[in-house]
Design a protein with these regions (language model features):
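His/Asp/Glu-rich mid-to-C-terminal helical/loop segments that flank catalytic regions of hydrolases
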Residues: 91-160
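Amphipathic alpha-helical surface "interface" segments used
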Residues: 70-78, 151-162
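Metal-dependent peptidase/peptidase-like ectodomains
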Residues: 1-94, 98-100
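Short, surface-exposed, polar/charged, turn-prone segments marking secondary-structure boundaries
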Residues: 16-21, 48-52, 116-120, 138-139, ...
Length: 162
């Protein structure tokens, strides 16, 4: 997250020209995912774009499967949130074998030397995940400037001071 923090504080373009952040961090691509969790989508007008993109891809949106973990504040996108920029962190979901794949990866490889390029990957799942994120990004690029939802905690904490 150090690199994301540096970039969010020292962007190569004016911060005001960054309208949203779409974070692709650690999707588990070892199974045919049928759902995703979009952390933060419900906090801003990014949410409807995510819903439309997922519907076009026939991918279900699932709620946070581990809300006590605070995942919305634990990835690169949060550094942009701290700068007042709406963000979404999309990851593969727990349906269709996803929970087992996630828990196995966490137990066996997460932050361990075995987390390397020798791990299996389903390239069809990778292509689907990339396409979904492209669809989300295209929606955001072609639509109105994203805005925080009125009364959102992170909007009140970070967006108003920018």
């Amino acid at each position: 997250m150090i690199g994301a923090d540096y970039f969010a504080r020292n962007p190569a373009v004016p911060l005001s020209s960054i309208v949203a952040d779409v974070d692709l961090d650690m999707p588990i691509l070892t199974y045919d995912f049928t759902d995703v969790t979009a952390f933060g989508a419900d906090r801003s007008s990014v949410g409807p774009s995510v819903k439309r993109a997922a519907a076009r891809m026939n991918v279900k949106l699932s709620p946070d499967p581990m809300p006590d973990e605070g995942s919305f504040t634990r990835s690169d996108h949060y550094r942009f949130v701290e700068q007042g920029i709406p963000a979404v962190f999309v990851t593969t979901g727990f349906a269709n074998g996803g929970e087992k794949a996630f828990r196995d990866f966490l137990a066996e490889h997460y932050h361990k030397p075995s987390d390397d390029l020798s791990q299996p990957i389903r390239y069809d799942a990778g292509a689907k995940f990339a396409r979904l994120n492209y669809e989300i990004t295209r929606e955001l690029a072609d639509g109105a400037r994203p805005s925080w939802n009125k009364g959102d905690f992170f909007a009140d904490k970070f967006a108003k001071r920018k």
